Amino acid sequence: MLLMLSVVLCGCEKDSGQNVFSIVTLNVTCPSVSAGIERVEVDNSLDGSFIRDLNTRQEYDIPTFQVGTATVKLRKGIYMISFDGKAVFSDGQRKKVRFAGYNSPMTSVTLLNDKETLNLELTVLK
């Protein structure tokens, strides 16, 4: 009984306010196409498509972008982000696209806030 009471009391510890995760909103644009982005499906099976934590080397799948936006929950840290995908634009065009802006340790991005927003500029692949 004493053990159960101590578990209950310890389980009610007040939140320290220190969240180890960040909710990251990813917004994509494609300046070379005048139409807006409706959807981007990332090919997570490719070696070049990743969200990678530089400290732990853990990789996360990149979600599908709806109306140019996707959200992912990541442990706070430093990340490399790169991906190839298929974009559908508001005028019906379909194109292969790439984001490689944070594809190396030298160009990585630091995500330390509880909420982060990244604006990613896509390149159309030929």
For each of these PLM feature ranges, what is it?
Residues 14, 86-126:
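Structured interaction patches on ligand/partner-binding surfaces of diverse proteins
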Residues 6-30:
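Bacterial Sec-dependent N-terminal signal peptides
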